[in-house]
Amino acid sequence: MRILLSNDDGIHAPGIQTLAKYLREFADVQVVAPDRNRSGASNSLTLESSLRTFAFENGDIAVQMGTPTDCVFLGVNTLMRPGPDVVVSGINAGPNLGDDVIYSGTVAAAMEGRHLGFPALAVSLNGHQHYDTAAAVTCSILRALSREPLRTGRILNINVPDLPLDEIKGIRVTRCGSRHPADQVIPQQDPRGNTLYWIGPPGDKCDAGPDTDFAAVDEGYVSVTPLHVDLTAYNAQDVVSGWLERAGVNTQW
């Protein structure tokens, strides 16, 4: 198995380093990751400037100022030859649950892999301690994919409780929960009197029902949520069509 591994925490983050070590026990791994933390970069792609890469002695490649999407795009299209069988993103320091997937660079890297035609996993740890647990879970799922390919065309968003491996209760297939909108903005002033703003923490959970990713992780289970790239709201197409007609939108411009 050939694995392209990326993240959004940066190439030196403990999550990606731990996962690379575990994956290299049974797979060919090419790490292509940002040279610094790019958390919250979502699906952004660098189009207005060039991208510089740096290779380490072990073959890992850092992309200067690159986004997670940049890294996977470069990895698939030029940096990993032969190309990958699967794209893996993580291990993220902290969860990507519910609405987090909208902003997550970890999920975005996996989404880019899927967009380019590859099976893709996004892996996050609900904390900052038990990276070995998340790595072991990821390896188990990848071995399962090797034995029995999953042909859903979906991204698997995997969230792992921050627990020792022997305390993990199992795996649940879940849906994304949701949070209340985040609305906290923290103002500060720099020494010159200019106003600075920090975006505050995410909102509290508002939908954490028993079938959600929030509930699974809180109860000690690994959450596996299938995600898809197609954002079309098919069930709303007829509703929007009817609304346009009733509202009398004139297409004779």
Curated annotation (Swiss-Prot):
Intracellular or extracellular location(s)? Cytoplasm
Q: What class of enzyme is it?
A: hydrolase
Q: What is its main location?
A: cytoplasm
Report the GO terms under cellular component.
Answer: cytoplasm
Task: Reply yes or no: does the keyword Hydrolase apply.
Answer: yes
Name the coenzymes or cofactors required.
a divalent metal cation
Cofactor binding description: Binds 1 divalent metal cation per subunit.
Q: InterPro entries, from UniProt?
A: SurE, SurE-like_Pase/nucleotidase, SurE-like_sf
What Gene3D superfamilies does the database record attribute to this sequence?
A: Survival protein SurE-like phosphatase/nucleotidase
Catalytic activity field:
a ribonucleoside 5'-phosphate + H2O = a ribonucleoside + phosphate; a ribonucleoside 3'-phosphate + H2O = a ribonucleoside + phosphate; [phosphate](n) + H2O = [phosphate](n-1) + phosphate + H(+)
Q: Which domain of life is it from?
A: Bacteria
GO MF terms listed in the record are:
3'-nucleotidase activity; 5'-nucleotidase activity; exopolyphosphatase activity; metal ion binding; nucleotide binding
Q: Which residues bind a divalent metal cation?
A: 8-9, 39, 92
Q: Which UniProt keywords apply?
A: Cytoplasm, Hydrolase, Metal-binding, Nucleotide-binding
Stated EC number for the protein is 3.1.3.5, 3.1.3.6, 3.6.1.11
- What PANTHER family does UniProt report for this protein, alphabetically? 5'-NUCLEOTIDASE SURE (PTHR30457), 5'_3'-NUCLEOTIDASE SURE (PTHR30457:SF12)
Function noted in UniProt: Nucleotidase with a broad substrate specificity as it can dephosphorylate various ribo- and deoxyribonucleoside 5'-monophosphates and ribonucleoside 3'-monophosphates with highest affinity to 3'-AMP. Also hydrolyzes polyphosphate (exopolyphosphatase activity) with the preference for short-chain-length substrates (P20-25). Might be involved in the regulation of dNTP and NTP pools, and in the turnover of 3'-mononucleotides produced by numerous intracellular RNases (T1, T2, and F) during the degradation of various RNAs.
NCBIfam families membership: PRK00346.1-1, PRK00346.1-3, PRK00346.1-4, surE
Q: Which family does it belong to?
A: Belongs to the SurE nucleotidase family.
HAMAP family of this UniProt entry? SurE
Q: What is this protein called?
A: 5'/3'-nucleotidase SurE
Look up and give the organism this protein is from.
Enterobacter sp. (strain 638)
Classification from the root reads: Bacteria, Pseudomonadati, Pseudomonadota, Gammaproteobacteria, Enterobacterales
